[in-house]
């Protein structure tokens, strides 16, 4: 069991990401065909063409100048007019900061509108896609056994609670966690790597590997230890994924009793928070979840409601 946890604030994330140096990005599809796209900075947003990797022309320069003006690295200090890997990475990084944008590296009407006119809800790394005031109870890593997993999943469901569960791929391979079973019982399952390394110590290609099977393949992921840097962020974006960490760390992995963990959750949680716990420790059971729910209710806070079933990928917002 890994015990070290490190939280990186959203403010640091946004500020640092804007100044991120260009990193090698996943190659687009080999059949991608570029086209010459023409527009100017005075062209109405609604009339600007959709831009993709491989495109060239004056409209690409307009895009690049906007990105440079916002502090995003495009792999060059000036607009080249070629939509290459540097521009692709910058677009993805920008899209990942806006809650309602799809992270696909394509500059269509919605992305153009956000780039030019601003607006749109900023994505919170710590609270994730939760747009409600309800508290999300999340559990990482791996349960002690498959029966312990089933008991907690069914217990939370019986309480009307949806959990966010972040198992490692090794845990799934060991047969102690089933993503499909958790989803069938109304819980959200997100990526937590395959083998739980510190992703900030890995190369871009190695991070991308950790975001794939046998780990959970989905639209959100939690880097082990809450650790991420420019390389990690770009790897997530290249997979169309957003990073989701936490607001409240219970430190249950230090051996805290169930009562201590429950008290921490109730004392420190605020509206809309995501709480970090671990499936292998003392609060991954129905009685602990019930105590958290009732304790938070006494403070006027609800917990994320169980929708009955969930899907392998999740919408850009979760209302809980």
What are these model-derived regions, one by one?
Residues 227, 232-233, 237-268, 301-312:
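His/Asp/Glu-enriched short active-site or ligand-binding loop at hydrolase and phosphoryl-transfer sites
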Residues 120-129, 155-159, 172-174, 283-320:
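C-terminal domain-boundary segment and adjacent tail
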Residues 1-35:
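Secretory targeting and sorting signals
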Residues 51-117, 167-170:
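Short acidic, glycine/serine/threonine-rich helix-capping segments at coil-helix boundaries
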Residues 65-72, 92-100, 112, 116-120, ...:
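Sec-exported extracytoplasmic/periplasmic mature domains
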Residues 113-198, 206:
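Active-site beta->alpha N-cap acidic-glycine motif
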Residues 154-167, 187-188, 195, 203-229, ...:
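CE4/NodB-like, metal-dependent polysaccharide N-deacetylase domain
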Residues 142-148, 166-177, 197-204, 222-228, ...:
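Acidic-and-aromatic substrate-binding clefts and catalytic sites of carbohydrate-active enzymes
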């Amino acid at each position: 069991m890994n015990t070290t946890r490190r939280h990186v604030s959203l403010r640091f994330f946004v500020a640092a990401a804007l100044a991120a140096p260009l990193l090698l990005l996943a190659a687009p599809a080999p059949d991608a065909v570029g086209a010459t796209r023409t527009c100017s900075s005075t062209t109405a947003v609604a009339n600007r063409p959709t831009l993709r990797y491989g495109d060239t022309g004056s409209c690409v320069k307009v895009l690049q100048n906007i990105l440079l003006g916002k502090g995003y690295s495009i792999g060059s200090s000036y607009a080249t007019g070629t939509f290459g890997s540097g521009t692709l990475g910058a677009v993805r990084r920008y899209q990942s900061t806006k809650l309602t944008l799809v992270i696909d590296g394509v500059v269509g009407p919605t992305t153009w509108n956000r780039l030019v006119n601003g607006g749109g809800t900023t994505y919170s790394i710590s609270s994730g896609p939760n747009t409600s005031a309800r508290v999300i109870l999340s559990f990482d890593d791996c349960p002690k056994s498959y029966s312990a997993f089933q008991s907690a999943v069914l217990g939370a469901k019986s309480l009307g609670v949806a959990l966010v569960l972040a198992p490692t791929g090794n845990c799934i391979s060991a047969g102690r966690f089933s993503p499909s079973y958790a989803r069938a019982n109304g819980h959200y399952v997100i990526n937590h790597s395959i083998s739980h390394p510190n992703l900030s110590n890995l190369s871009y290609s190695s991070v991308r590997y950790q975001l794939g099977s046998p780990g959970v393949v989905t639209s959100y992921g939690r880097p082990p230890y809450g650790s991420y840097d420019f390389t990690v962020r770009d790897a997530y974006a290249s997979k169309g994924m957003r990073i989701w960490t936490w607001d409240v760390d219970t430190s249950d992995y230090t051996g805290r009793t169930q009562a201590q963990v429950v008290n921490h959750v109730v004392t420190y949680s605020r509206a809309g928070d995501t709480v970090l716990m671990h499936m292998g420790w003392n609060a991954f059971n129905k009685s602990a979840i019930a105590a958290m729910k009732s304790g938070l209710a006494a403070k006027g806070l609800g917990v994320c409601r169980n929708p009955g079933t969930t899907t392998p990928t999740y919408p850009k917002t979760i209302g809980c």
